[in-house]
């Protein structure tokens, strides 16, 4: 697949096949996603892979999804969930600790979005459907 085709064809997938995704494949996708650009190359994105059915079920609740019932159903049926987190206090800062711009430390939100899209495109290339659910804030 070429990049333009992947960008045009990749879709959010909320109905997943009833089979596990090999951990090795998820790891490969994460490794590719780590090449996503970030503010001043701070590389703040971190990935947590959840492929244990009991732990996935624990994520599929009102508290984690802020009551979005559709997200609860999507998570509950997923064979794996990848949580994208960021390292706080690195993006938007100079080496002396001062802010680089008036956006202060909010660059990590942009970096997380870039990393999430890169992950989804890599997953698509590997034949794995994905959807971005932005519901955790803590």
Language-model segments: residues:
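Specificity-determining recognition surfaces
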Residues: 1-27
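Helix-loop element at the rim of GNAT/NAT acetyltransferase active sites that forms part
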Residues: 9, 35-36
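Basic/polar, acidic-poor N-terminal "presequence/leader" segments
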Residues: 27, 39-41
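Small-aliphatic-rich amphipathic alpha-helix that forms the alpha element of a beta-alpha
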Residues: 29, 33, 82, 100-138
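Glycine-rich, charged/polar anion/phosphate-binding loops
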Residues: 31-35, 66-69
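Glycine/small-residue-rich phosphate/adenosyl-binding loop
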Residues: 41-113
